[in-house]
Design a protein with these regions (language model features):
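Cys/His-rich short segments
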Residues: 1-21
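Short, conserved phosphate-binding/catalytic loop or strand-edge motifs used
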Residues: 29, 47-50
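DNA strand-break repair and replication-stress modules
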Residues: 6, 13, 35, 42-43, ...
Length: 190
């Protein structure tokens, strides 16, 4: 991949809909990449505060906030991590379907064309794209590093539903919040 593609992949991974790493906008990612602080998405989890101190616009406060945000991104659900990998043709909806079907990244890595095609809404183009992604040793290496960093790469088995489960209720979130409605919805339902 060329530099703009690599930067784009990191930007996608850090985005709100994927890993939601606060304080890591497109400009900052491009700067970190150009300065050699990060070369791929796995490098985000090995950033040291010292490596950021020399960079423009990085005071102690913003470094601390960024490191905290990267750390808290490790709690993102499997489908968000899967979406963040940037597999061609795998959007949010497909990532959710894959996570619910394969339950772990290892099951997905070891899947074949038939098992992928059996997933609702996955056609040949998406299935081949997934297989190609996991046949690339660089991608496998990155996934391994992300696993070692502690990201969630499996569906956490749901506890038995309690009688007051909210999943079949309509919940309206109104007002002003620090986090997005999407995040609030995620917290309520999970």
């Amino acid at each position: 991949y060329c530099d703009p593609q690599n930067i784009g992949r990191i930007q996608h991974f850090a985005s709100r809909k994927a890993m939601n790493i606060d304080g890591l906008g497109n400009e900052r990612i491009a700067l970190f990449y150009r300065q050699g602080v990060i070369k791929n998405i796995a490098d985000l989890y090995t950033i040291s505060p010292e490596s950021l101190q020399e960079l423009e616009g990085m005071g102690d406060k913003s470094i601390e906030k960024l490191i905290d945000s990267i750390e808290s991104s490790k709690n993102r659900l499997f489908h968000k991590v899967l979406f963040g990998l940037g597999i061609r043709h795998v959007g949010e909806t497909v990532a959710i379907k894959l996570a619910n079907t394969f339950k772990s990244i290892d099951e997905l890595i070891n899947s074949d064309i038939e098992s992928l095609l059996s997933v609702n809404e996955i056609g040949e183009k998406i299935a081949e794209s997934i297989l190609n992604y996991f046949q690339d040793s660089t991608n496998i290496s990155i996934v391994k590093k992300l696993k070692n960093a502690g990201l969630i790469f499996s569906i956490q088995e749901k506890k038995e539903r309690s009688p007051n489960s909210l999943s079949d209720k309509k919940i309206v979130v109104t007002g002003t919040f620090k986090s997005s409605r999407e995040e609030i919805k995620d917290k309520i339902l999970h």
